């Protein structure tokens, strides 16, 4: 059987693709730098606090955190260890499953999230949302939903991720 012919990107498509990659890299680096400077936490740490804040009892299994962030369990474990040392999170055995581990946000973690959220939202608006018209932003959301739907269709293992986005 013959391999399918490669459909190369046009010049415009290549420029748009590179702009997307560069823009996302610069955006996440900038948001991370702003949070570190103002509050002493990374963007990844902030995102863990957000996920915990949205969970019942501000608690989640470590594996769920890793899945929702698309990070390895090892990476999340290292991040949570730092956060635990800073008093932002505690870890305990998962209820009903001694093999599982849950991370729970402390009051100190909650207070830091409440303090850092305006910095983060201001950065997201200034460096991303407010740069596009409502129509452009809606189109981008529609495109990213199409990307997610496609990737879910070809890899059902990603379904848990979609549940954490909606």
Model-derived segments and spans:
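Charged, amphipathic alpha-helical coiled-coil/dimerization segments
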Residues: 2-5, 81-139
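C-terminal regulatory/oligomerization modules of transcriptional regulators
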Residues: 1-11, 134-166
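Short, hydrophobic-biased segments on the C-terminal half of alpha helices
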Residues: 62, 80-81
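Alpha-helical linker/hinge and terminal dimerization helices associated
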Residues: 24-27, 31, 69, 112, ...
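N-terminal leader segment of winged-helix/HTH proteins
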Residues: 1-39, 86, 165-166
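N-terminal helix-turn-helix DNA-binding core of bacterial DNA-binding proteins
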Residues: 29-72
